[in-house]
From Swiss-Prot:
This reaction introduces a second double bond into the aromatic ring system. Keywords: Amino-acid biosynthesis, Aromatic amino acid biosynthesis, FAD, Flavoprotein, FMN, Lyase, NADP. InterPro entries: Chorismate_synth, Chorismate_synth_AroC_sf, Chorismate_synthase_CS. NADP(+) binds at R47. SUPFAM superfamilies: Chorismate synthase, AroC. The lineage of its organism: Bacteria, Bacillati, Cyanobacteriota, Cyanophyceae, Synechococcales. This is Chorismate synthase. Its cofactor is FMNH2. The keyword NADP applies. Its EC number is 4.2.3.5.
Length: 365
């Protein structure tokens, strides 16, 4: 099972939903980088369970412990180890699921592959695994902000069939976090919240779409063929729990356009390193390499698989059974997935920034 990600800026996560704790080891972070621990905690608080009545009622404070790699607010260049201890585990909630495969959950495929799985909370398939990613991503966000003034903003674009209309030029973190669903469109955010609450009362769930905008992206990130920037972003984001789709730039809607309509024309510039385009259908990446425009992406999340409705399934012996989940689960993962998307995008960009400097840094004037 692969639990590591990245080439130079490399993370390895560990832990399980109902084990002693979860965490991450971040290797390859440059030395003497200023790190604000409060900003790491802020990102974890945005991901934390029990933060509102549209998330899981599991009550965890998710306080970060820095075990190594940072001293007096500066990185040492050595591995950064971070840990969050689990405090509100209830493995007993899953006694009836130990040998039963939840529909559309990883229980069945884990059992098919390994012949054994951590029944309580889904083990490594739990969203609690993302704590390590979010902590490491918070370090990556500070690296990108300090070195390039790069800003990563993600928000809930759609919940179920309720879509939003957001002015990307005016989007800000304060607007995103102004409500519990993390949709900056005030007109529809209340409707989204009501929909999630209604489905929660029914013992059901829903999915949706998160949109991500990255500003002040350095040009030249990414490499041709197998290490294209959008390919690595897709892999990173599709590795998050419950993701089912990835789109960059015009995405699938671009297939309805002609080349003359879709092409992003370049604008004359005295500085070729600051080349700009009249449109951004490419989503900030061309030929697998960032062009300096904003990176724009959308990520689709399926409805939460574990629900409170009775469902037909089979057990480990292949016998048909009826099951009804008793654990604490999100009726919709999207409000808490926003910082997860931020984190994975930050990790990819930080890794490619270091890779680009390693390959091309010495050759630049």
């Amino acid at each position: 099972m692969s639990s590591s990600f990245g080439k130079i800026f490399r993370v390895s996560t560990f832990g399980e939903s109902h084990g002693g704790g979860v965490g991450v080891i971040l290797d390859g972070c440059p030395p003497k980088l200023k790190i604000d621990i409060k900003l790491i905690q802020n990102e974890l608080d945005r991901r934390r369970p029990g933060q509102s009545d549209i998330t899981t009622p599991r009550n965890e404070d998710d306080k970060i412990e820095i075990l190594s790699g940072i001293k007096e607010g500066l990185t040492l260049g050595t591995p950064i180890a971070m840990l969050v201890r689990n405090k509100d585990q209830r493995p007993g909630d899953y006694n009836n699921l130990e040998q039963v495969f939840r529909p559309s959950h990883a229980d069945g495929t884990y059992h098919l592959k390994y012949g054994i799985q951590a029944g309580s909370g889904g083990g490594r398939a739990s969203a609690r695994e993302t704590i390590g990613r979010v902590a490491a991503g918070a370090v990556a966000k500070q690296l990108l902000k300090n070195l390039c003034n790069t800003e990563i903003l993600s928000w809930v674009k759609r919940i179920h069939d309720i879509d939003s209309d957001v002015n990307k030029e005016k989007i800000s973190l304060n607007k995103i976090d102004s409500n519990i669903v993390r949709c900056p469109d005030e007109k529809v955010s209340a409707e989204m919240i009501d929909r999630i609450k209604d489905l929660k009362r029914q013992g059901d769930s829903c999915g949706g779409v998160i949109e991500c905008l990255v500003r002040n992206v350095p040009s030249g990130l990414g490499m041709p063929v197998f290490d294209k920037l959008e390919a690595d972003l897709a892999k990173a984001l599709m590795s998050l729990p419950a993701t089912k789709g990835f789109e960059i730039g015009s995405g699938f809607s671009g297939t309805y356009l002609k080349g003359s309509e879709h092409n992003d024309s370049f604008i004359k510039s005295d500085d070729i390193s600051k080349l700009r385009t009249t449109s951004n259908n490419s989503g900030g990446i061309q030929g697998g390499i960032s062009n300096g425009e904003n990176i724009e992406m959308k990520i689709a999340f399926k409805p939460t698989a574990t629900i409170g409705k009775e469902q037909k399934t089979v057990n480990a012996e292949g016998k048909e059974v009826l099951m009804k989940a008793k654990g604490r689960h999100d009726p919709c993962v999207l409000p808490r997935a926003v910082p997860m998307v931020d984190a994975m995008v930050a990790l990819v960009l930080a890794d490619h920034l270091l890779l680009n400097n390693a390959q091309c840094g010495l050759m630049k004037n």
